[in-house]
Amino acid sequence: MCGIVGYIGNKDAFPILIKGLRRLEYRGYDSAGVALVNSDTALNVYKSKGKVDNLVEYCSDKNVSGTVGIAHTRWATHGEPSALNAHPHYSESGNLAIIHNGIIENYSDIKKKLMANGVKFRSETDTEVLVQLIEYIKEHKNLDLLTAVQVALHEVIGAYAIALLDKRTPHQIIVARNQSPLVVGIGDDEFFIGSDASPIVEYTDKVVYLEDGNIAVLHKGEELKVVNILNRRLNPEIQTVDINLGQLDKGGYPHFMLKEIFEQPDCLTNCMRGRVNVDTDNVVLSAIIDYKKQLINAKRFIIVACGTSWHAGQIGKQMIENFCRIPVEVEYASEFRYRNPVITSDDVVIAISQSGETADTLAAVKLAKDNGAFIYGICNAIGSSIPRATNTGSYIHVGPEIGVASTKAFTGQVTVLTMLALALAKEKGTISSSDYLEIVKELHEIPEKMKKVLELNDRISELSRIFTYAHNFLYLGRGYSYPVALEGALKLKEISYIHAEGYPAAEMKHGPIALIDSDMPVVVIATHNAMYEKVLSNIQEVKARKGKVIAIVTEGDDNISRIADEVIELPTTIECLEPLLATIPLQLLAYHIAVCKGKNVDQPRNLAKSVTVE
């Protein structure tokens, strides 16, 4: 993995490919490369370690002419980060070039077979094995390129999204997908390729999201041809994407992450638009209207997710159980799919993923669906794989999230889970009218209260400078605030590279308290709710051991203000909605500490935005 771009048409391909790679930088990568076929049918492949800027500099004195090309940003999976292991990879003859996202699981067996037949390899990657296999089949069986690709992919086990060039047929690109996203943009006598739509939308809003097992032939001057591995012609749906190009730029902010933190009030307004009606004091989700029977009669909900989405799921669990009186389990998708879980037709599985392409979550959806469960998706990326695989669901509608560390997607996911719990509870009759109306009205007020929290940015920026020395942080919360503590710790780890752990506050005495000393900052979410007094006792225990307390409190709190080292006050809200406000100071704290330490906030080391391989 991580990013695929391609172009075939009448324009110079190189600038389109480079701009496309820049659009995909948010996904994370360690090297980049490009392959172009020029008018003399020469195949030129250029690769470099590091950023796209390095590739552009390397190509500054190279022949980058041509109207057909493919390009790639790579996160190392097989073979170390290097120019040699970067994509594109080319065949032994130099006729074919390929880019690939995914993992070929049986690459070692295929490589041994090819080496036994005299094929020589340059790199350590599974991707080179694939291009060598395609050429070997093409030449030894005297097949055309499409048929050779179909035969080769029949031998392959694993996930892939590929784009393939042959300099002998310079007017076509062949692409294929299995368990890794791939989008084809359709322009005026031209085609575009992307891992997602972001490299494409500047040129066309007409796209085809390839399905697993699809192989597409992009031939200049012809219609898009899509077939399966058995060469049966398919008729994919051409969709219209609506992405504002301004959402793909920083908009005057120094980093995408800060921009996206500040976008959250507007994002939540968009998320609730047409769903939360304050005039009628009602929450309406089309999924519950269309699939009321399946959702109301469910005996159990299972939430599957990874990372930040898993934390949102933990908040959703508490709301669904509290309001709907349905038992809820929250599972890491990577564990769920491999532990032979008990799944029945009475279960509703909620799959949460910002990208809609998270490999483990997608596999968990397939497992649950195969076992008869009803699947509800909560995603951000419209047209992505998980929404297409589910029975129904809700988009969070927060716009493209470019920063690798999720911010607005988290609050969008929590908002959708809140609306789902409220709407379902009302249908089931498990929530009182007064509680329902109070929460609906307060939910509508959350975006304005978020704006007040964001006014604390300068204060949190100053506070962050005090704690850049720390090598460890502890985050504590109880009830709805415990997942917020987990999320705050994750944000700090992701972008500042400071070790941090989130714990239920009461569990501090069962181990973590041994770590607390004068060098240990402890972030405590201590808003004024039912467990306030107990959390106050935890803070006193931290202070007794000389720990430095950063307390997130409800405005007007005098008790904690007297004992905590630093206090951040939040507007008053209902307990179940506190995560939507309390998470923002933790996002800002992580951001400003990372900036103070000189870290790459938008592209932290070793992390990819969309984890499309296991």
PLM regions and their residue ranges:
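Conserved short alpha-helical segments that host acidic/polar catalytic motifs at enzyme active sites
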Residues: 1-250, 254, 269-300, 338, ...
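Glycine-rich oxoanion-binding loops at beta->alpha junctions
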Residues: 67, 71-84, 279-292, 316-352, ...
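Structural motif
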Residues: 68, 96, 300-302, 348, ...
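Acidic/histidine-rich
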Residues: 156-190, 463, 468-494, 531, ...
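Active-site phosphate/pyrophosphate-binding segments
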Residues: 264-268, 272-302, 392-521, 594-614
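Glycine-rich phosphate-binding loops that contact phosphosugars or nucleotide phosphates
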Residues: 296-438, 442-445, 525-566, 589, ...
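Generic C-terminus detector
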Residues: 548, 561-563, 573-614
